[in-house]
From Swiss-Prot:
This is Protease HtpX homolog. GO terms for biological process: proteolysis. It is found in: Cell membrane. The active site is at residue 145. GO terms for molecular function: metalloendopeptidase activity; zinc ion binding.
Length: 298
């Protein structure tokens, strides 16, 4: 089961990369058509920019994500002994290398894992998590994060985060260039086919970040159920994980969190209350009640 899930996540990584690159190509085509009337040229430029951006953020994913979330590295066990030793124990049980450990100074209990692979992983916990959770609950949370590391979820989410950010950057560039002076000529506005092409390009640029966000959120929701079950497998203590999730239900939003990193956390750090019919498409996590229910059925 474990190795099947790892293989499945690797296949998902390939599919996610392919899907995002298709989206990037379409955005490049739209930008190229709008501003230079060259679809191929726009696609090539977008691909080059995206590859450079992805190489930087993926190559430095841990440092980038930790800076975005104001996390401070724990250099030795003496700086945070309980957290350090729990992470060390859970890494040993999960049979992965000891990850780097970080602390986020925020009263809201939360945690996340990031990195490219188990050899370059890192976990972060808020001061609120360390203060509000007892040892069994903290073990459950860290086991959850170690499951993400072991199953290569961290690579999948890092790639999704990098590509979604690259898409947002390209769309932001297109919007700024449009207002500065990249609008179409009067000849284009008089040509019906050009008008439709322009409108289609604008619509694609507007909807692309939405599509990227929905894909990223779906990946995040799916991986949480598996990590909860993995935490129970590692600790042999379902009640510890259930109790931790119960406490997360009553947590307040984090004070300082980067929205693009929300999907990485064990629980939605922004605690957004959405009640419209399509809210589930944009949820970064499954409802905590459903996660608890699944654990109780194990």
């Amino acid at each position: 089961m474990l190795y099947q899930q790892i293989a499945r996540n690797k296949r998902k990584t390939i599919l996610v990369m392919f899907g995002f690159f298709v989206l990037l190509a379409l955005i490049g085509a739209a930008i190229g058509y709008l501003f230079a009337r060259t679809v191929i040229g726009g696609m090539i430029i977008a691909a080059i920019i995206a590859v450079i951006y992805m190489s930087v953020i993926i190559g430095q994913s841990t440092d980038v994500v930790m800076r975005m979330n104001n996390a401070t590295e724990v250099r030795s066990a003496s700086d945070a002994p309980e957290l350090w030793h729990i992470v060390e124990d859970m890494a040993l049980v999960a049979r992965v290398p000891m990850p780097k450990v970080y602390i986020i100074h925020d009263p809201s209990p939360n945690a996340f894992a990031t990195g490219n692979d188990p050899e370059h992983a890192a976990v972060a916990a808020t001061t609120g998590l360390m203060e509000k959770m007892n040892r069994e609950e903290l073990e459950g949370v860290m086991a959850h994060e170690m499951t993400h590391v072991r199953n290569y979820d961290i690579r999948l989410q890092t790639i999704a985060l990098a590509l979604a950010s690259a898409i947002a950057m390209l769309v932001n560039f297109a919007g700024n260039f449009w207002w500065i002076g990249g609008r179409s000529s009067s000849d284009d506005r008089d040509n019906p086919s050009s008008i439709f092409a322009i409108l289609g390009s604008i619509l694609l640029i507007i909807l692309a970040p939405l599509a990227a966000t929905i894909a990223q959120m779906a990946l995040s929701r799916n991986r949480e159920y598996l990590a909860d079950a993995g935490a129970v497998e590692l600790t042999r203590n379902p009640q510890g994980m259930i109790s931790a999730l119960e406490k997360l239900k009553t947590a307040v939003p984090m004070k300082h969190v980067d929205p693009s990193s929300s999907a990485l956390y064990i629980s939605d750090p922004e605690k957004n209350a959405k009640h419209h019919p399509f809210s589930n498409l944009f949820d970064t996590h499954p409802p905590l009640d459903k996660r608890i229910e699944r654990l109780r059925q194990m």
